[in-house]
């Protein structure tokens, strides 16, 4: 009976549409429609909403706001065929990434085409697909050690500079994501810590060089697309002045395989080679010469920049060559004390030695390329090139042939190997093979110093009576005279002077003219020496190959660099 009464009430409500029951029923209908609209949309688009948070978990929130606040996939939904409620955040939110994404500067290259899949996608993965510097460690702005010493070079090398440059847009698609599988193991991170950009090894994937679709670019750093425009903007007239004095025999060398090492050096700055932590000793010109050389020995360094307080600038370098020149000029006999070494100040010695022919200190900016550094070292016939910040005036590091070649050798296995690396020394003609200066084991030290000064060389092979190379006496060995305070007696023999290193000396590092250049480079870098003695089958001296000879062959000779008639300032 209860059921009959219920049916009667239902009929009464239906038969009287103008009554209160009719109004209540209409409101119920309207409410039911509101409830079921989001359910239909969720079933109609299961891939969009169902894969995000679950189809039944937030159905009440989907009624009022179809887009979850802060969802990274709002930009994708706005492109769907379904009519969506307009929202001020539905269209322009694509560049906004999740908090863990390192890139926010390339919205333009991804608004051209919508993603193929409507599923949730990570923005970091999207940006990584067309930018080689997408890893968190490759962004200088997020790297903890990115601006430790010289923030200016880090800013100019980052992607955040001029993202709208047309050159960058055309080069974004040159390097696909697949090139990352050839990424080297970043040995520089272990050796140089954060001193070099984390993306340096990624530029030299073999697939990048061999890609037939690589567009020709005017910049010598065309194989590094993500930093080409930044490097071009960073090189000002002061840094690029040296390269303007170079001529190239053939412009095609820029794209040839033989110029791969030259392009490597052009794409890296001097700051990239500066270690995270190193020792740099600076001398004031009012310091006594004797104390300065003792300080070199105590700190284990071979050279130091000279600071003049009157000019408030660096005016030169004090090296072991200065020590040799002082001994060569003022040594008389073991009975006469070298007064000039004991009492002279550095500024006094410079005035006497240079005799008013003062030349400005040859230095280089941390923003200059390593190609500039190699050219400056070889052209000026110097062995040490101070890196000085032009803004603060601080000395950051001292570049050498040895350091530059070691940096280059770290990446050689990841670059295409030029054909000349498989040629031997005889075919390439690298080294010095005529008028070789040498000494004997019983040669006095003072005579060896005279040869250093007159021939302007840095090492002398020691040859016995049979002509066999048994040792080598270099300029660096002369500083041991200051360490042992035996510089007042230069009549001792070379053998006696070299006894201090007999315990750890492993012998002369040698080679022959039939060995290929690749073997020579590997041997001189591993041995950490400045030269190799070229010998024949009888172990007799044939020639000398130095670090400058190797850098000339690897970098400058393939570039066809010529010095113009004008002098470099």
UniProtKB/Swiss-Prot annotation:
Post-translational modification: Phosphorylated by ULK1; leading to negatively regulate AMPK activity and suggesting the existence of a regulatory feedback loop between ULK1 and AMPK. Glycosylated; O-GlcNAcylated by OGT, promoting the AMP-activated protein kinase (AMPK) activity.
Residues holding AMP 3: 383, 432, 437, 458-459, 530, 546-549
Disease per UniProt entry: Wolff-Parkinson-White syndrome: A supernormal conduction disorder characterized by the presence of one or several accessory atrioventricular connections, which can lead to episodes of sporadic tachycardia. Cardiomyopathy, familial hypertrophic, 6: A hereditary heart disorder characterized by ventricular hypertrophy, which is usually asymmetric and often involves the interventricular septum. The symptoms include dyspnea, syncope, collapse, palpitations, and chest pain. They can be readily provoked by exercise. The disorder has inter- and intrafamilial variability ranging from benign to malignant forms with high risk of cardiac failure and sudden cardiac death.
Gene: PRKAG2
Signal peptide (residue range): none
Glycosyltransferase listed as a keyword: no
Disulfide bonds: none
Chain positions of motif AMPK pseudosubstrate: 370-391
Source organism per UniProt: Homo sapiens
SMART domains reported in the protein's UniProt record: CBS (SM00116)
Basic and acidic residues biased stretches: 179-189
UniProt name for this protein: 5'-AMP-activated protein kinase subunit gamma-2
